[in-house]
């Protein structure tokens, strides 16, 4: 099953997440199909906190991909802003 979820990157105590489309059987930070955005929870000042390609996310959801709880919340926040 294909899922849209967060893949963690960044340094220790400084998380940075890529929003990726991946097979649910692959590991969290492992192989993915496509990057559809990023989320930087520690962004300060003028730094960009969230960027999502909503067209690609809706495409993958239309193809049957499931969305993780956290990504669903991020998409909701992005569409409201």
Swiss-Prot record:
GO cellular component entries: cytoplasm; small ribosomal subunit
Instruction: Name a GO molecular-function annotation.
Output: structural constituent of ribosome
Which biological process, per GO, is one annotated for this protein?
translation
Keyword flag Ribosomal protein: yes
The protein's UniProt keywords, in alphabetical order, are:
Ribonucleoprotein, Ribosomal protein
Write out the similarity annotation: Belongs to the bacterial ribosomal protein bS16 family.
Q: What is this protein called?
A: Small ribosomal subunit protein bS16
Organism lineage reads as: Bacteria, Pseudomonadati, Pseudomonadota, Gammaproteobacteria, Alteromonadales
Q: Which gene encodes it?
A: rpsP
């Amino acid at each position: 099953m294909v899922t849209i979820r967060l893949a963690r990157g960044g340094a220790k105590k400084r998380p940075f997440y890529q929003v990726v489309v991946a097979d649910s059987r692959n590991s969290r930070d492992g192989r993915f199909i496509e990057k559809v955005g990023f989320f930087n929870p520690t962004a300060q000042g003028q730094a960009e906190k969230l960027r999502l390609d909503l067209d690609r996310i809706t495409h993958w959801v239309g193809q049957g991909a499931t969305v993780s709880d956290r990504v669903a919340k991020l998409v909701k926040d992005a569409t409201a802003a």
